[in-house]
Amino acid sequence: MIQPQTHLNVADNSGARELMCIRIIGASNRRYAHIGDIIVAVIKEAVPNMPLERSEVVRAVIVRTCKELKRDNGMIIRYDDNAAVVIDKEGNPKGTRIFGAIARELRQFNFTKIVSLAPEVL
């Protein structure tokens, strides 16, 4: 469960290392975001000499959360960290690689480009 002021790791090579959520895209009064939701975030830590810089406002899709994700078949998935992938206005990732495992539910939300770049889909 991601809410405003939550810090997230970045799971791609776009140049950002850490994000802070400032808004959840969707309904006007949503409190929490889960896997597959789009957030507006500010870059808190960035790699030097990369296109994305610190204090830049970006959109990102959440790919991992510490909060459990319960599937219809009864399986429960929990990750060790909160992570997101930086995306553009069309929903395509800004980076060319994805690090770490991501949830299969992203395919249902039409993030097929992110799923195809991921090394492991759980």
Curated annotation (Swiss-Prot):
GO CC annotations, alphabetized: chloroplast; cytosolic large ribosomal subunit
General function of this protein: Binds to 23S rRNA.
Compartment annotation: Plastid, Chloroplast
Domain of life: Eukaryota
InterPro entries on file: Ribosomal_uL14 (IPR000218), Ribosomal_uL14_bac-type (IPR005745), Ribosomal_uL14_CS (IPR019972), Ribosomal_uL14_sf (IPR036853)
MF (Gene Ontology): large ribosomal subunit rRNA binding; structural constituent of ribosome
Chief place of localization: plastid
GO biological-process terms attached to the record: translation
Originating gene: rpl14
Subunit structure, interactors included: Part of the 50S ribosomal subunit.
Name of the featured protein: Large ribosomal subunit protein uL14c
Family statement: Belongs to the universal ribosomal protein uL14 family.
Keyword terms of this UniProt record: Chloroplast, Plastid, Ribonucleoprotein, Ribosomal protein, RNA-binding, rRNA-binding
The species this protein was found in: Ipomoea purpurea (Common morning glory)
